[in-house]
Every structure is written in structure tokens, then in C-alpha cells.
Regions:
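Short, extreme N-terminal segment that most often corresponds to the first beta-strand
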Residues: 1-23, 103
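Extended Gly/Ser/Thr-rich low-complexity repeat segments
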Residues: 21-25, 60-84, 95
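Short acidic DE-rich linear segments
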Residues: 97-105
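Short secondary-structure junctions
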Residues: 27-36, 90-95
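A general secondary-structure signal for short beta-strands and their flanking turns/coil
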Residues: 1-4, 45-49, 92-94
Length: 105
């Protein structure tokens, strides 16, 4: 599955670095490189928004590596549990970014 998230932050430069650091860590744990793409940001009303595309192989590797943690995450649907896990993972690494799943296929 390919997941596309809309990310939002009020501290784009700081959170972008923290996001890249956290995603780099999770890629290393999953033995994946180039598992996601960040689109160009758009700023509105003090917030900066951008899309993050998570490639299928990265998503599947995360599900395999962290299956127990994902199962315990909030949500009734698998994609909700995955998103909650990812938000918790980022937050634990100091990244205060907000993620909203906008498409998965």
C-alpha cells in the first residue's frame, strides 16, 4: 500500500529536520532507503502544510518490524492504527508534526 499524508506544522524548519531524522531511524531499522518523499511546502495562516508519500515497500517493512506496536495503537481500521503508530513514533523523537492520512491504495 502507498500512504499519502498531509503534514502540518507551525515550525517547519525545525520539524522537517526532526521528521527526516526520525524517518531515517525507522528506515535503518527496516533496512530500507528512499522509503518516502516529501513534497514542497505551502504556508497558510501561520501553518506550513506539505505532503509525505510513503512508498509501499517502506510501509510494509514498518508493518512487519513493528506489528505488535501497531496492533496496540488507537484506531479501528488498519490504516488508523498505522497512522497513530507513526504519529507516536515521531512524537517520541521530538517531532510535533501533525499527520492526516489523505489517501491510501
Amino acid at each position: 500500500m502507498t500512504y499519502i499524508y498531509e503534514a502540518a506544522t507551525t515550525k517547519y524548519d525545525d520539524d522537517k529536520l526532526l521528521l527526516r531524522k526520525a524517518m531515517g531511524k525507522i528506515q535503518n531499522l527496516c533496512k530500507i532507503s528512499d522509503g518516502y518523499i516529501l513534497e514542497e511546502p505551502v504556508s497558510k495562516f501561520g501553518w506550513t502544510f506539505f505532503q509525505m508519500l510513503m512508498k509501499t515497500n517502506f510501509h510494509l517493512a514498518i508493518e512487519e518490524e513493528f506489528s505488535d506496536m501497531i496492533k496496540k495503537s488507537k484506531g479501528s481500521k488498519p490504516q488508523e492504527k498505522f497512522t497513530d503508530f507513526l504519529l507516536s513514533y515521531l512524537e517520541n523523537d521530538g517531532c510535533k508534526i501533525k499527520l492526516k492520512l489523505i489517501e491510501y491504495s
